[in-house]
């Protein structure tokens, strides 16, 4: 797997194990299997989206990486898998919830155990999300369903 990095600050692209695209403003014209935008909101606009139609997946680590909902819907209709930012960025929220609602378990556990729990919870939600996408629901509909879903406080589910 090749991992490419681009940033307006070229020094930030010097990451071991990656291929730097430097500060290339036309980075999106390259062919990628997976894109993980970790930058400003609205990065993927209509102009950029047209170059991403061969991409297999976009994992949205940036908050609101698409310029508007129509862009993400067009990419979804082109069979590009999009994992939305609320799912991708859930780890910190889950860890905070453990610390708040299970403080005893939090204080006696090793970080690796928390990471494993977080990874498991995020993975479950991502698979549930992908299953609902395949059933024909839109990202917006799924996120509303997940938001309105009644469930236990996730931090209380962590048992060390």
Task: Describe the residue ranges of each PLM region.
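Rossmann-fold NAD(P) dinucleotide-binding segment
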Residues: 24-31, 41-59
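Short, glycine/polar-rich helix-capping loops at beta-to-alpha or helix-loop-helix junctions
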Residues: 10-13, 44-47, 66-71
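Glycine-rich phosphate/diphosphate-binding loop of Rossmann-like nucleotide-binding domains
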Residues: 1-34
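Fold-independent oxyanion-binding glycine-rich loops
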Residues: 6-8, 38-40, 61-62, 86
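A general structural motif
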Residues: 19, 36-43, 62-67
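Adenosine-phosphate binding glycine-rich loop
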Residues: 55-160
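Short amphipathic alpha-helical segments
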Residues: 17, 47-50, 70-72, 95
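Short coil/turn connectors at secondary-structure junctions
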Residues: 1, 31-32, 54-55, 77-78
């Amino acid at each position: 797997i090749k991992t490419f990095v681009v940033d307006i600050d070229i020094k930030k692209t010097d990451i071991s194990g990656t291929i730097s695209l430097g500060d290339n403003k036309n980075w999106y014209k390259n062919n990628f299997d997976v894109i993980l935008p970790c930058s400003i909101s609205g990065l993927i606009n209509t102009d950029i989206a047209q170059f991403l139609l061969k991409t297999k997946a976009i994992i949205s680590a940036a908050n609101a990486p698409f310029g508007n909902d129509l862009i993400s819907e067009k990419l979804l209709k082109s069979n590009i898998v999009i994992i939305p930012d609320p799912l991708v960025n859930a780890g910190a929220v889950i860890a905070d919830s453990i610390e708040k609602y299970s403080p005893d378990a939090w204080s006696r556990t090793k970080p690796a155990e928390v990471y494993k729990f977080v990874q498991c919870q995020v993975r479950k939600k991502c698979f549930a999300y992908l299953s609902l996408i395949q059933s024909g629901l839109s990202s917006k509909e799924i996120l509303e369903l997940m938001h309105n879903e009644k469930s236990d406080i996730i931090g209380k589910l962590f048992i060390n």
